[in-house]
A protein has these predicted regions:
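Conserved Class I SAM-dependent methyltransferase catalytic core
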Residues: 11-14, 18, 24-37, 240, ...
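Non-catalytic, mostly N-terminal accessory regions of nucleic-acid modification and defense proteins
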Residues: 1-176, 180, 241, 245-250, ...
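Hydrophobic alpha-helical scaffolding
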Residues: 108, 133, 215-219, 263, ...
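Conserved P-loop NTPase
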Residues: 369-410
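Conserved, well-folded catalytic cores of nucleic-acid-processing
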Residues: 18, 121, 125, 146, ...
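Accessory, often C-terminal, charged low-complexity segments
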Residues: 270-298, 303, 326, 336, ...
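Hydrophobic alpha-helix feature that most strongly marks membrane-spanning transmembrane helices
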Residues: 205, 231, 235, 269, ...
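Conserved S-adenosyl-L-methionine
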Residues: 158-266, 271-282, 288-293, 304-305, ...
Length: 821
C-alpha cells in the first residue's frame, strides 16, 4: 500500500529534526541531503540500467545501512562518500560533510546513534525512488524541495538564502511564459545566482519539452546542493559552476564575451556591499561603464550590478526575471540613471510585480520581480505594474503567497489588463514625468480603507449616504438588500437609518430575496462544475497524472465562478479547491495513481521498536477509531452504511458524559465526605467507599450515606455504560471490516468522489458564503454603532451623570464642583 506523500515528507522532517539535536539546521542539511542523495542513486541504479551515476562496490545505500551500530560508522561513511565522489566527478559536492565531526554529531556512542538514526530515517520502504507512482510524480524532487524549505526556515537570518520560496519561483516561471518554450534541450535557462537550483528547476518544470540548465553560485557548499538537486531531479546535463558572477562570470563565448541565454532567472543576494572587486568600472563585458553609456551601480549596493548582468546575459529574443528589493525602484543618483537607461533608452523592462514583505529567507524587506524582455523592446510603450503586496498568508515567521495570489498575479499579467488598485499599464511618458521613479504606489492607487467621520452625522444623527454607498459591491449583486437594511432618514436628506434591528442584520441578509437568489446561483455553479468533471474523476486509474488533473479542475472552477455574479470572489473559490487539493485530494490522487481504487483498512503503529531496541507488540484494533483508510475514511463509511449503530454509540456516550458530569459535581459539592482522610490508606475508590458506608450510622450520617451510595451508583452506571460502548464499537468495527472487504471499485469511487471530495468542497464553499454574510453584518453594525449617539445626546447623558455626581457629593458634605471652567 502506498503511503501519502505529505505524511511521508512530514515524517522525514520530523525524524531528521529530532536527530539533529543542537546542531544548526544550516549545517545539518549537509548530512541529511547527502544521505538522501545516496538513497536516491541506489534506488535508481537498481531499476534503471541507463542511469549515469556509478556506484562503486560497497557504496550503495544498503552498504550504508550495514554500518548502523558499528563504532567506526563515521569513518566508513566518509570513505564511501569519497569513493562515490571520485567515481562521478562530485568531489566537494557530496563529500563536504564530515561524518566523524564530534562537535556536530557527538562523541562515541552518541555519534554512532545519531548516524545510525539518520540512515534509519531513509530505510522507509515507502521511500522508493526507483519508480514514480504517476506520470508526473516526482517523489524525489518533491522530497528534496520539502527538506530544503524546512532547512531554510530553520536556518535563521542570513543562512536561508540558498532557497527561493517555491511560490515566487512559480510566479516567475509563469510570467516568463516558459510553457511556450518548445525547442526542447536547445532552449537555455540560466541563473547567475542559482543557490540550491530550485528556481532553475521550477522554470524547467514549466517547459513542455524540457531545456538545458546553466547556473553559477558563489558559495562552494551551495554549489554542491545545486549539483545534487539537479541529479535528484534527473537533470544530469545541467551545468553548475562556482564563482563570483559579477567579478568572475563563468559563462562566456569563444570571443570572451558573456554568453547569452533564452531565459534568465535570478534571486541574487539583496544589496551586496563592496561588490566591485576584480570587475572594473569600465566593465570588460559591457554590463556598465561610460563607454557603453550605462551608469555604474553604487559600490555599496550591488542590486543593479546583478540586474545589468542579467540584461547582458539575455539573448536578443530572450527574456528574464529578477527578484530585487523594492529600493531599486526609487533610489536615486547612479541607480536613477540606470533606470532611465533600462526604461526609456533600451525599453527592456516589460513589467514589475510588487511582492509582500517578509517573504524571503534571510531578510524581511519587501521585494519585487523585475521582468526584462528584449524581443519587443523597440515597440514597448510602457511598463506593466502589479501591486501584489496585500495578497499573502502568514506561514510561521514568514509570509507566503496563497494559491489564489499566484493565480491572480499570473492571470492579470497574461491578460495585461488594468485592475483597480492592483494592476496598471503605465506609459513611459508618465514614468518620465516622475523622473523614472518606478515606485509602484506612484502609479497604482491603494484601495481606500480609511473610515471618514461625518461630523454632521455625529452632531445630528443618521447614517451618511457616503458610508452606505461604500458597500456598493453588495448592492450591485443584491439590489434589494440595500433597502432591506437601510431606509432614508425621516428628517435628513442624504442620510439613512437602519431598516431592521441591529441584532437582526444577519437574519435580514440571509432572508433577502436577491441574496437567496445569488446564493442559489453560487450553489448551481458548484453543481455545474461537479457535473462537468464527474466522469473525468470516475475514470481515474493507475498511472494517471495528478498535476495535470488539478490544473484542469482548478482552471475550469475559476472560469465558472468568474462568470457567476457572486458575492464570493472567484479566486477565493479557487483557493478552497487548491487548499483541499494540498491537504487531502492530492494524496488521494497519488494513491489512486499508484494502487488504483483500493480501500484498505489498517491499524497505525506508533513505533516499531522500543527504547531498548526490542520489537514492540503490534497494536490491535478494538474500536473503529483504531483503524484507518487513507482513501476512503472510516467516518464516511459509518455515515453511509451504519448510521443506526453510530446513533446508538453516540447515545451511550451521551449517557456516559452525563454520569461523569454528575459524579464530578457530586465530588465538588461534598468535598468533606470525599476527603481522602475518611478512607483506608487515604485512597478514594469503590472498595474503600463501601467500607466507609458500613461504619456510618443510618440516622446520624444519613446525608453522607446517601451521598456515598449515589457515588457508587454513578460509578456503576459509568462502568456499565463503558462496557456497552466497548461492545457497540467492537460490533461496529466487525461490520466495518466486512464492509471494507466487500467494497466494489464502483462503490469506492462513488463514496470518495461524492461523499468525500465533493462534500468537503461544498462545505468549504458554504463557509465562504457565510464569511461574506459575516463581513457585511460586521460592516453594517460598525456603521450603525459609529453614529448611534449624537453629540447632543452624549452631552445630555454627561449632564445627567454630572448632576448625579454633584448630588452624591452634596449628600457627603462636599461643595459642588464646577465642570464648565
Amino acid at each position: 500500500m502506498a503511503i501519502k506523500k505529505s505524511e511521508l515528507y512530514s515524517t522525514l522532517w520530523k525524524c531528521c529534526d529530532e536527530l539533529r539535536g543542537g546542531m544548526d539546521a544550516g549545517q545539518y542539511k549537509d548530512y541529511v541531503l547527502v544521505i538522501l542523495f545516496v538513497k536516491y542513486i541506489s534506488d535508481k541504479h537498481k531499476t534503471d540500467s541507463d542511469f549515469m551515476i556509478e556506484i562503486p562496490d560497497g557504496c550503495s545505500f544498503d552498504d550504508f545501512v550495514a554500518l548502523k551500530g558499528h563504532s567506526n560508522i563515521g569513518e566508513e561513511m566518509n570513505k564511501k562518500m569519497a569513493s562515490l565522489a571520485e567515481a562521478n566527478g562530485l568531489d566537494n559536492v557530496i563529500n563536504v560533510a564530515d561524518f566523524c565531526d564530534e562537535q556536530k554529531l557527538g562523541k562515541g556512542k552518541d555519534l554512532v546513534e545519531t548516524l545510525s538514526g539518520l540512515i534509519g530515517v531513509f530505510e522507509n520502504s515507502d521511500l522508493d525512488f526507483g519508480r514514480n507512482r504517476a506520470s508526473d510524480d516526482d517523489l524525489m524532487g518533491d522530497a528534496y524541495e520539502y527538506l530544503m524549505k524546512n532547512f531554510a526556515t530553520e536556518s535563521g537570518k542570513s543562512k536561508g538564502q540558498f532557497y527561493t520560496p517555491a511560490e515566487v519561483s512559480r510566479v516567475i516561471a509563469k510570467v516568463l511564459e516558459l510553457d511556450k518554450a518548445r525547442k526542447g534541450i536547445s532552449t537555455t535557462i540560466y541563473d547567475p545566482t542559482c543557490g540550491s537550483g530550485s528556481l532553475l528547476l521550477r522554470a524547467l518544470a514549466e517547459t513542455p519539452k524540457g531545456a538545458t540548465l546553466y547556473g553559477q553560485e558563489k558559495d562552494n557548499a551551495t554549489v554542491g546542493l545545486a549539483k545534487m538537486n539537479m541529479i535528484l531531479h534527473g537533470e544530469m546535463y545541467a551545468e553548475i559552476k562556482q564563482g563570483d558572477t559579477i567579478n568572475d562570470p563563468q559563462y562566456k563565448d569563444g570571443d570572451g564575451h558573456l554568453r547569452t541565454f533564452d531565459y534568465v532567472v535570478a534571486n541574487p543576494p539583496f544589496s551586496t556591499k563592496s561588490w566591485l572587486k576584480s570587475a572594473k568600472e569600465e566593465d570588460e563585458y559591457g554590463r556598465w561603464g561610460p563607454r557603453n553609456n550605462i551608469g555604474i551601480p553604487p559600490e555599496k549596493n550591488g542590486d543593479y550590478a546583478f540586474l545589468l548582468h542579467i540584461v547582458r546575459s539575455i539573448a536578443r529574443t530572450g527574456c528574464g526575471a529578477c527578484i530585487l528589493p523594492h529600493g531599486v525602484l526609487f533610489r536615486g543618483n547612479a541607480e536613477a540613471q540606470i533606470r532611465k537607461y533600462l526604461v526609456a533608452e533600451k525599453r527592456y523592462i516589460k513589467g514589475i510585480i510588487g511582492l509582500p514583505s517578509n517573504m524571503f529567507f534571510g531578510t524581511g524587506i519587501p521585494a519585487c520581480i523585475i521582468v526584462v524582455e528584449k524581443a519587443e523592446a523597440a515597440n514597448r510603450k510602457g511598463v506593466f505594474m502589479i501591486d501584489a503586496k496585500a495578497g499573502f498568508v502568514k506561514d510561521g515567521a514568514k509570509n507566503r503567497l496563497r494559491e489564489q495570489d499566484i493565480r491572480r498575479i499570473v492571470d492579470v499579467w497574461q491578460a495585461q489588463r488594468d485592475v483597480p488598485h492592483f494592476a496598471r499599464f503605465v506609459p513611459i511618458e508618465e514614468i518620465a514625468r516622475n523622473d523614472y521613479n518606478l515606485n509602484i504606489p506612484r502609479y497604482i492607487e491603494a484601495e481606500d480603507t480609511e473610515i471618514l467621520q461625518d461630523i454632521d452625522a455625529h452632531l445630528n444623527g443618521g447614517l451618511p449616504a457616503h458610508d452606505v454607498e461604500q458597500l456598493e459591491t453588495y448592492w450591485k449583486i443584491c439590489p434589494s438588500l440595500k433597502s432591506d437594511l437601510f431606509v432614508p432618514h425621516a428628517t435628513r436628506s442624504g442620510y439613512f437609518a437602519l431598516a431592521c434591528a441591529q441584532d437582526a442584520i444577519r437574519e435580514t441578509v440571509n432572508a433577502n430575496k436577491d441574496f437567496r437568489h445569488q446564493a442559489a446561483l453560487f450553489t448551481e455553479s458548484f453543481v455545474a462544475w461537479c457535473n462537468q468533471h464527474r466522469s473525468r474523476l470516475y475514470e481515474l486509474k493507475p498511472g494517471h497524472a495528478p498535476k495535470r488533473l488539478i490544473e484542469e479542475l482548478s482552471s475550469s472552477l475559476l472560469e465558472i465562478f468568474k462568470q457567476d455574479r457572486s458575492l464570493v470572489d472567484a479566486y477565493d473559490v479557487y483557493d478552497c479547491l487548491m487548499n483541499y487539493w494540498s491537504e487531502t485530494m492530492q494524496d488521494d490522487c497519488y494513491l489512486i495513481a499508484s494502487d488504483g481504487w483500493k480501500a484498505e483498512l489498517y491499524t497505525p503503529q506508533p513505533m516499531t521498536k522500543s527504547k531498548d531496541n526490542k520489537v514492540k507488540k503490534a497494536k490491535k484494533a478494538a474500536t473503529p477509531e483504531d483503524v484507518v483508510c487513507d482513501l476512503l475514511p472510516v467516518p464516511i463509511v459509518i455515515d453511509e452504511y451504519f448510521p443506526e449503530m453510530k446513533s446508538c454509540i453516540l447515545a451511550a456516550e451521551e449517557v456516559l458524559n452525563d454520569n461523569e458530569t454528575k459524579l464530578s459535581e457530586l465530588l465538588d459539592e461534598h468535598e468533606d465526605y470525599f476527603d481522602t482522610d475518611n478512607f483506608a490508606d487515604k485512597k478514594l475508590n469503590d472498595t474503600n467507599v463501601k467500607k466507609r458506608i458500613k461504619t456510618l450510622d443510618k440516622v446520624k450520617d444519613a446525608e453522607e450515606l446517601d451521598t456515598l451510595n449515589q457515588y457508587l451508583k454513578y460509578k456503576e452506571d459509568i462502568t456499565v455504560t463503558k462496557r456497552l460502548i466497548r461492545e457497540l464499537k467492537y460490533k461496529l468495527l466487525s461490520a466495518l471490516l466486512v464492509r471494507y472487504a466487500d467494497f466494489t471499485e464502483d462503490e469506492i469511487k462513488r463514496l470518495v468522489i461524492e461523499k468525500k471530495w465533493f462534500a468537503a468542497l461544498s462545505t468549504r464553499l458554504d463557509g465562504e458564503m457565510q464569511r461574506v454574510v459575516q463581513q457585511l453584518t460586521t460592516k453594517v453594525i460598525a456603521l450603525a454603532e459609529r453614529y448611534a449617539e449624537t453629540l447632543p445626546q452624549i452631552d445630555l447623558a454627561l449632564a445627567d451623570l454630572e448632576a448625579k455626581v454633584a448630588g452624591h457629593l452634596k449628600q457627603m458634605g462636599f461643595a459642588a464642583v464646577r465642570t464648565d471652567l
